[in-house]
A protein has these predicted regions:
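Solvent-exposed, non-transmembrane helices and loops of integral membrane proteins
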Residues: 2-9, 89-137
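Hydrophobic alpha-helical transmembrane segments and immediately flanking/interface helices
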Residues: 127-154
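Short, extreme N-terminal leader segments that mark the start of a protein/domain
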Residues: 1-23
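Alpha-helical transmembrane segments and their immediate juxtamembrane boundary regions
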Residues: 15, 19-22, 26-90, 145-171
């Protein structure tokens, strides 16, 4: 690709951005797997606790567990697909964003736009940087925050249910 006036090697920059984008996608997949695990475990514990409440086995303990597991499942579902207000906060979309692509009337016009980026290395670096920034700030970070909330509800629910169970045994 060559270098610009400042000596920036565009090939190295594109490899760096490609590696950064791959790492970000891998982190997002890891969060998705963790969200799926929390959703599954919380759902199982929720179903178990509801059946125990129905059978009148330690209703207070299982009510506490149920409430926390409902909150864990809901926040995990939001982590799987964060709400729009967390994902889109008026950021400038890159040309690689699917809705930006759909705005072009034809594939030929989109191709022309991509070719203009390929002919202008600074514009290509800018688009790559914008895409990485948007994915990180408006996709990965909201998913991570919601996953942590879900995990905290899950752990808190188990801890509170355990404390409630021990308390009911002692008193």
């Amino acid at each position: 690709m060559g270098k610009n006036e400042a000596g920036l090697d565009y090939g190295a920059a594109m490899r760096f951005y490609g590696d950064t984008l791959k790492k970000l996608i891998d982190l997002s997949r890891q969060i998705d797997m963790q969200v799926n695990m929390i959703t599954s475990l919380s759902s199982v514990l929720l179903a178990f606790s509801v059946t125990q409440i129905i059978q009148q086995h330690e209703p207070v303990t299982f009510a506490v567990l149920s409430v926390c597991m409902v909150c864990a499942v809901i926040s995990a579902l939001f982590a799987a697909h964060p709400p729009r207000f967390m994902r889109r906060a008026g950021q400038h979309q890159s040309a690689m964003y699917s809705k930006s692509i759909a705005r072009y009337p034809s594939a030929v016009e989109y191709e022309a736009q991509l070719r203009s980026f390929l002919s202008d290395a600074d514009a290509m670096v800018g688009e790559y940087a914008r895409e990485i920034y948007n994915l990180s700030k408006y996709y990965y970070i909201p998913k991570r925050k919601l996953y942590l909330i879900s995990r905290n509800f899950f752990v808190s629910g188990i801890a509170l249910a355990t404390i409630t169970f021990i308390t009911t045994l002692l008193f």
